[in-house]
From Swiss-Prot:
Pathway this chain belongs to: Cofactor biosynthesis; FAD biosynthesis; FAD from FMN: step 1/1
GN (gene name): flad-1
Residues annotated as signal peptide: none
Biological processes per GO annotation: FAD biosynthetic process
Cofactor: Mg(2+)
UniProt domain comment: The molybdenum cofactor biosynthesis protein-like region may not be functional.
The protein's name: Probable FAD synthase
Biological function: Catalyzes the adenylation of flavin mononucleotide (FMN) to form flavin adenine dinucleotide (FAD) coenzyme.
Keywords from the named record: ATP-binding, FAD, Flavoprotein, FMN, Nucleotide-binding, Nucleotidyltransferase, Transferase
MF terms (GO), sorted A to Z: ATP binding; FMN adenylyltransferase activity
Region annotation FAD synthase: where it falls in the sequence: 332-489
Homology family: In the N-terminal section; belongs to the MoaB/Mog family.
Catalytic activity line of the entry: FMN + ATP + H(+) = FAD + diphosphate
Length: 523
């Protein structure tokens, strides 16, 4: 379901410009080519404050192009077409424009000059391919096709973004209709080069946009949302509600559009009151700009949630990692990373402190102790996380003692090893403090366990509060990960529907922290 709650009767004329997009091409209608141009244009026009009222797709028929363009041109301020501009027989946009405006076609010498600049390169390319016969005729036909445009056309020369020079090829405009190429690369480039000419900064309508995410289904609050929209009926506010079925962090996205900062703030407050306790500060790239996001997260937990004890744990763990990063060079620090939830917390903390001191481009050193019959999903997550977080992960056979020996042999300079061990872990219970040297009969490393005193709930609160990506097995009912031979979905998360079908709740829904590892047979 998709819902839009319009808190506006009709925009007063002359305030916000309107536009229609006409996509032209049989290949779009046949499904042989995917249209990405309308999506690109909608995003760009929307950011410019233009109200997109319509998207139409028509085939390569002159009458269809003419009819759609004529209708849109009289109804909206701007019409942007894409496709049907080129040298072949089925490129009929210019013919359709001439028909729509009862105009004649003529040959443009200005376009011919632009075409002539490309011809030597084209001819040389064909000759290098051994094609010489008939090339002059091809050039003649191509030139005639590209240069034949409606007589009333205006040629728009854009500004190249790289060097500020005039664009190399013009775009045809007839009345309020702008004809862009259909090839996405050229369509996007042409729009970029013409944006400020078509939509001067001083003429743009100021618009304010915001997005709020919630872990509620939209059915849970749709009636109350309609009431909020009604309260702002006279303030030109538009609230959109969009369900998301596959996102692990939120279920519904709300968008707000308005013309004033005052009404935006009022709507934002109203929606946050409506969704209190269920707002998600969604972040699709949690591994970027980590320092600022970390500060904002702690502030929310302290000010909004009054979660003093949790913030204290965050800061204690942060301080431990910070001390290690300050004390040791990065080539002496390694992170034990097996794709589990605890070491994922550590990965984010280490990335945060490395970003703070060295910058995001600095790589992190890590290693993975392999387990027998490892879940392929865990392996894939390690690969993905390594790419996101810029961590170089070595693999060593297990168990841990043998793996550490392999690490020290390959990287003898390693001293501190960050681990996601907690006091409730089978091995974590032997640690008295978060930072300890290994026993004398082990490879000598400094074991650093910043979240030693965290609970299962603490781990999930941080991961989900910052939208840190984690292994998808945790959303399938697994609460602790080992190998496939000794790990099952947690029985406490099993749900049986009325039709007898079963499914499992995600791991963060487990209420009893003490049962975290009861889905593992070897612990």
């Amino acid at each position: 379901m998709r819902a839009i709650f319009r808190a506006t009767k009709r925009m007063p004329p002359g305030q916000r410009k309107t536009a229609a997009i006409v996509v032209i091409g049989d290949e779009i209608l046949k499904g042989t080519t995917r249209d990405t141009n309308s999506h690109f244009l909608c995003k760009r026009l929307h950011k410019l404050g233009v109200n997109i009222k319509k998207i139409a797709v028509v085939g390569d028929e002159i009458s269809e192009i003419s009819r759609e363009v004529q209708s849109a041109s009289s109804a909206y301020d701007y019409v942007i077409t894409s496709g049907g501009v080129g040298p072949t027989h089925d490129d009929k946009t210019y013919l359709g424009l001439a028909h729509a405006f009862t105009d004649q076609l003529h040959f443009s010498d200005e376009i011919r000059q632009a075409v002539n600049r490309f011809l030597p390169t084209y001819i040389d390319k064909k000759k290098s391919e051994g094609v010489e016969e008939g090339i002059e005729e091809v050039v003649r036909v191509v030139t005639e096709k590209l240069c034949t445009i409606p007589k009333m056309s205006q040629l728009l020369w854009g500004t190249q973004k790289v060097d500020g020079r005039v664009s190399t090829f013009p775009v045809v405009r007839v009345a309020n209709v702008v004809a862009l190429p259909g090839v996405p690369k050229f369509c996007e480039r042409a729009f970029d080069e013409l944006q400020d000419q078509l939509f001067p900064v001083e003429e743009r309508q100021s618009m304010f946009f915001d997005t709020i995410y919630t872990d509620l289904d939209e059915f849970d609050f749709s009636r109350r949302l309609a009431d909020v929209a009604a309260r702002f009926e006279e303030q030109n506010v538009q609230i959109g509600s969009y369900p998301e079925l596959k996102n692990k962090f939120f279920k519904t996205k709300l968008t707000i559009e308005t013309e004033s900062s005052e009404s935006m703030e009022a709507v934002r407050i109203a929606l946050k009151e409506l969704l209190v306790g269920h707002i998600v500060y969604y972040d699709s790239h949690a591994w970027t700009d980590t320092v600022a996001k970390w500060r904002a997260f702690k502030k929310r937990e302290l000010v909004e949630a009054k979660n003093v004890d949790f913030v204290r744990k965050l800061e204690e763990a942060e301080k431990i990692v910070e001390d290690i990063v300050e004390r040791y060079p990065l080539d002496q620090i390694a992170l034990s990373f097996n794709g589990g939830k605890d070491c994922t917390v550590l990965l984010h903390l280490l990335r945060l402190k490395v970003d703070e001191k060295y910058g995001a481009s600095k790589a992190i050193q890590g290693f993975h102790i392999m387990v027998e019959d490892q879940f392929p999903e865990a392996t894939q997550f390690i690969i993905d996380a390594a790419q996101f977080y810029n961590i170089q992960v070595l693999e060593f056979p297990g168990p841990l003692k043998i793996g550490l020996a392999g690490l020290k042999k390959q990287r003898p300079s390693i001293i501190p090893v960050l681990m996601g061990s907690r006091a409730t872990d089978p091995n974590g219970k032997y640690m008295k403090t978060p930072v300890e040297w290994t026993d004398s009969d082990w490879p000598k490393v400094l074991r650093v366990c910043p979240i030693l005193n965290w609970t299962y709930s603490d781990v999930w609160h941080m991961l989900r509060g910052l939208c840190v990506p984690y292994c998808k097995l945790y959303d399938q009912g697994y609460t602790s990960l080992g190998g496939r031979d000794n790990t099952v979905k947690h029985p406490a998360l099993r749900i049986v529907a009325s039709d007898g079908k079963e499914h499992y709740l995600p791991a963060y829904k487990l209420h009893n922290d003490a049962e975290e590892r009861s889905n593992r047979s070897n612990l």
